[in-house]
Amino acid sequence: MKAIIEIAQYGVIEVELDPEHAPISVENFVKLAEKGFYNGLTFHRVIKGFMIQGGCPKGDGTGGPGYCIKGEFSANGVNNPLKHLRGTISMARAMDFDSAGSQFFIMHKDCPYLDGQYAAFGQVTKGIEVVDAIASVKTNAYDMPLNKVIIKSIKIEK
């Protein structure tokens, strides 16, 4: 299963989703994408050499879909062997292990210290140069891009 993430003025990122290792995360992401939840939202947190984060309906990292899902990672008792390598997509969360909702991040560089702490659920297969371009945008002191990086749409191919 594939997610096609179209970013206004940047291009397309294709992600191969992994429902075998993160079925709850994949099902949630697919459901939100198919109902158009992500359309028009932004990548609100960008840290070059680390990751790009999006999927917040408030655009500031404090919003979500109105519910939370179980965190699928080893620190939360779930066997998810997916690593946080360059191009990995993973669910963002607060301190609570089961606090992920709609926000996700895509790794700009390998970050093994996130393994087992966050629910990785797929890998970029095309468009890593788009991730690189977004990771290079100018940001403010809160890691928010000075110019909005807008998700036009996320389409799912099954």
Each language-model region and where it sits:
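Cyclophilin-like peptidyl-prolyl cis-trans isomerases
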Residues: 1-158
